[in-house]
Structure formats: C-alpha cells, structure tokens
C-alpha cells in the first residue's frame, strides 16, 4: 500500500511540474486507522480527496494518472472516480473538499492525511448514510464493520478527551455538511440524511457497541441535529426543491432583458414578490427592519434592433452566428443569422460613441423595436451552470431563491445598469437605499479561476473606495461559517459605486466570462453565496 501512495506522490510532483501547479490531495477512511495501528484489517482500497485546486485540475490529474501503463479506470461519474493502479483500488471523491486545518502532512510530498479525530467523527456520521434507504450495499455488513472500527478506535482515542471533543469542532461539521449536501445534490437525494436520522435504527446494534461509546454516539448525533438545525433546514429545503430551482435557472438564465426591457423578466421571475416598482427599480419589501438591502441589476447587455439595424446596449460581445429576436414583451419571434460588424476605423473608445450597427442581419422587421441576443442553451450539470451571459441573471435567480427559502429579505432590482448605472440615479432607488444600514450587491465577476471554490468579495475598484470596517464584518461571517472567499480589486463599477458612502459591499460569484455567449459558473459557489446572504441578513446589525 505504501508503494501505491509513493507512486501517487511521484505522479503529483510530475503533474505539478509539467503544469506549473501546486495540486495536493489528502488520504481519508480506513487507511488512516490501519496506519495508526488502530485496526489490523488491511483496507481494500484508498480513499482520496483534493485539497486546494479547481475542479478542472482535479479531473486533469485523474486523467494524468490514467495515462500510466499500470492504471485503469474502473468506474466514473463526475463525483466518484474509481481507478486501479497495479491491481489496487483508488477512489477519488471529486466533490469533497476538506479545509487544511483538519489535515496533517504525511511523509509524502503533496499528500496530506485527515487528522485521526476527524476520521473518527466521519466514521460516526457515516452511520446515517449506511442506515438510510439510499445506501446501495449490505447495510448490516457495513454497520458491523463500522462498529468494530469504532470500538477499537474508541478504546484508544477516549484516553485523551481532546481526541473525542466534538463541541468545539463547529467548523469541521459545517465543512462536512456542505460536502454531504453537494454529494446529495449531485446524486439527486431529496433530503439531508443527517436531519432525518432515526435513532431507533441504531437500537438493534446497541449490544455491539462499547457501552460508553454507544452513549457518546447518541450524544454526538444529537449534537449535530440540534447545533446545526439552521444549516440542515436550509440545505434540506434546497434538496427538496431541486427541480423547482433548476427549472428556474433553465427558464430564466437566457430570458431576454436588455436595458429598458426588464419589466416582463422581473414580473415573471419574481411575480407577486415585487411590492413597489418604477422604471428605475423593483423592490421586494419583506423585513420590517430597514437593516440589510440586497441589490441586483436586472438587465443584461445585448442588441436593440431599430429600423431593421442592430445596435449594442452595454459591453459588446457579439460574434457571428445564430441570434434570437424578441419583441418588446420578450416573446421570441424569430431566429436569424447575423454577421459581426467590426468598426475598426476608429479606436474602441471612439467607436463606442458612434452610432453604427454592431451586427449585419437579414430578416429583422423594420417597423418595430426588438431585442437581439445570441442563441444559447442553458445547461445545469453536477458541477456547473452554463448559459449565455450570467451577468446579471444568476444574481437575480439567487435573490429569487432567497425569497423562497426565507421571506425575510429586502431585495432591490435596479434597471438599465448596463448603460452607465442609470438605475442607481433613479429617485425611487436612491430614496429606498438611504433607508438601510447595510447594502449588499450580489454580482458576478470575470475570473479565469472560476471553478475554484469561493465567493469573491470586492474590496475596491477604479470607481469605489474601500470600507474596511464593513469588509471585516463580512469576512467574519464567512469565517464563522467556513465558507471560502477571496478578496479582489474590481475592474469595473457596480451599483455600489453610487452608494459607497454607506455601509456597502459587493459579493461576486466567479464566472468564466461576464459578457459572452458561453458563461460558466460553479454550482458550489452559487449555494455558498445563497447561505452567506442568509447569514448576513440574520446576523449583521
């Protein structure tokens, strides 16, 4: 077994050198108990996870291993990938991420080990899965194996109270619940198993446990259900409504809403959740306290057809191809082929000020005004969200789901933001904003590392100064909830630009491209931000 781990370590070093990366993995599962001489039973396989890399790098490394002559693929989906190296089974759990604070270095470079106390905790939390209807193997056989390992480990670990103290390990359990949630989401489970664990199912195994261990496990599992009730309720509701939320993405990520045409889009997405509206913005008012206001743009960049010619509104991103034509009510009327027009006579800055068509299209009616957008298909996979331009649709859908999960949010949708932030200059918008203590702008940002886990916090940009006091409050909430984040300096403006003298900040989901016909974001980051918004709304004063 050590030879296999050594070979994997060599492959990581080779992979990192060839790609100028710092990929690291960690060992977990029964191997750790065997290595520490807790159990004599030699594991049948190695369980591995990734420490600090993007999801594309994870897959690239697995593919790199499979190039070896002695490696073969046994089973694969986007999460579980089982390999055989020299006849030994290696299992990668791609969706699982463990914070480095819960790991220790092994004797092998770039390979960490889950600390034994956390491996012990994981073995206990595994009971809920093994005793659930979704467990695909012999649950009784697996339970007896788990109990044997726990009894032996308990006799050793319980000698030091620090090894079994779970009350002080909130961050670890938050990390673990997120891992469980994303795996449940991927495999279409309809509930958080930890929330519904039935202690009666353990009763038939009571005589197999060491008595003190049995009491410990009951208290341990009760602690999880009680201390993380809010987390479990939140994640459980998402799983129960997965079809609704994915359909919301499928139906609205490509719904047309260029500047000035937002009305139909907002009314269909938010329906009776809108309580006040003007041409400059839409307000969903649900909280009696004017404490936190969440702000979104509601428009997107695109083309407007006037007298049969197409002009750009907002940042240009068109390429030649198939385009869709929508009327003023956002109803699709046609698909046409268009050719991109490059106005190269003048500089890019001057070209933007000259009223020249940006597309050459045939078949646009000359007697009306239409929205013109590139045709694109929305795809929701186990890992990613793919659509046309996710700026600003993904933020709007996130805000709408917030209202479904908890009606206690105040949300302001501004209009015409893609043409010089016109919505933030509207009297209704500015009048609403002045009433609140804290402003949180939900946004996306262009990031080549879009499939790294973590929300980006905009500290400042070329139009907005920092607010370090409010920034530190937000960071504290991220850290308290074990949600990864990255501070950054923005490259453009947001709604916050015009409100920066208040307690205002922008939280962004990284995407592969902002203004593009093909934009990708990570599902993990969508739900991380969803939870953070709830925590900000509940806990910042």
What positions do the PLM features span?
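Catalytic cores of NTP-dependent nucleotidyl/adenyl transfer enzymes across multiple folds
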Residues: 9, 84-235
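N-terminal hydrophobic/helix-forming segments and targeting peptides
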Residues: 223-541
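Helical scaffold of the NTase/Pol beta-like nucleotidyltransferase catalytic core
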Residues: 1-27, 226-229, 233-237
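A structural signal for isolated positions on well-ordered beta-strands in alpha/beta enzyme cores
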Residues: 24-26, 47, 91, 293, ...
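Short glycine-aromatic motifs
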Residues: 23-25, 71-73, 274-275
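Short polybasic amphipathic segments
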Residues: 81, 149, 154, 321-328
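Metal-dependent nucleotidyltransferase catalytic core
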Residues: 1-8, 49-88
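Active-site nucleotide-donor binding segment shared across nucleotidyl transfer reactions
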Residues: 12-46, 50-53
């Amino acid at each position: 077994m050590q030879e296999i781990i050594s070979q994997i370590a060599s492959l990581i070093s080779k992979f990192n050198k060839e790609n100028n990366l710092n990929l690291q993995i960690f060992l977990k599962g029964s191997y750790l108990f065997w290595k520490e001489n807790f159990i004599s039973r030699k594991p049948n396989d190695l369980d591995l996870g990734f420490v600090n890399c993007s999801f594309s790098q994870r897959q690239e490394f697995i593919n790199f291993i499979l190039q070896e002559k002695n490696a073969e693929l046994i089973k694969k989906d986007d999460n579980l990938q089982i390999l055989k190296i020299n006849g030994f089974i290696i299992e990668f759990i791609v969706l699982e991420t463990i914070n480095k604070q819960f790991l220790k270095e092994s004797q092998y470079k770039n390979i960490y080990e889950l600390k034994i106390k956390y491996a012990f905790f994981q073995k206990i939390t595994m009971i809920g899965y093994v005793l659930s209807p979704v467990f695909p193997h012999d649950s009784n056989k697996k339970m007896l194996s788990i109990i044997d390992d726990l009894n032996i480990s308990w006799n050793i670990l319980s000698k030091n109270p620090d090894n079994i103290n779970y009350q002080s390990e909130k961050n670890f359990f938050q990390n673990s619940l997120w891992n469980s949630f994303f795996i449940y989401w991927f495999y279409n489970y309809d509930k958080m198993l930890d929330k519904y664990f039935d202690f009666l199912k353990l009763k038939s195994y009571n005589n197999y446990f060491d008595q003190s261990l049995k009491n410990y496990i009951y208290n341990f599992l009760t602690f999880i259900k009680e201390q993380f009730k809010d987390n479990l309720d939140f994640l459980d509701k998402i799983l129960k409504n997965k079809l609704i939320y994915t359909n919301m993405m499928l139906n609205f990520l490509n719904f047309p809403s260029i500047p000035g045409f937002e009305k139909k889009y907002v009314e269909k997405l938010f329906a009776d959740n809108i309580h006040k509206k003007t041409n400059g913005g839409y307000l969903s008012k649900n909280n009696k306290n004017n404490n936190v206001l969440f702000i979104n743009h509601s428009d997107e960049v695109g083309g407007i057809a006037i007298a049969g010619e197409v002009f750009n509104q907002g940042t240009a991103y068109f390429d030649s191809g198939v385009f869709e034509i929508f009327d003023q009510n956002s109803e699709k009327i046609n698909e046409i082929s268009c050719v991109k027009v490059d106005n190269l006579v003048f500089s890019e800055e001057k070209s933007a000020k000259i009223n020249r068509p940006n597309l050459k299209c045939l078949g646009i009616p000359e007697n009306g005004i239409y929205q013109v957008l590139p045709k694109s298909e929305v795809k929701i996979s186990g890992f990613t969200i793919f659509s046309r331009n996710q700026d600003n649709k993904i933020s709007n859908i996130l805000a709408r789901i917030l209202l479904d999960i908890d009606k206690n949010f105040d949300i302001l949708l501004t209009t015409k933001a893609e043409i010089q932030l016109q919505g933030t200059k509207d009297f209704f918008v500015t009048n609403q904003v002045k009433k609140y203590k804290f402003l949180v702008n939900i946004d996306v940002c262009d990031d080549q590392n879009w499939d790294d886990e973590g929300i980006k916090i905009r500290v400042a940009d070329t139009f907005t100064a920092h607010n370090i006091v409010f920034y530190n409050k937000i960071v504290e909430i991220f850290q308290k909830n074990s949600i990864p984040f990255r501070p950054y300096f923005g490259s453009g403006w947001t709604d916050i630009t015009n409100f920066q003298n208040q307690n205002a900040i922008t939280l962004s989901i990284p995407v592969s491209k902002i203004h593009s016909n093909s934009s990708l974001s990570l599902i993990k980051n969508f739900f991380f931000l969803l939870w953070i918004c709830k925590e900000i709304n509940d806990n910042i004063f």
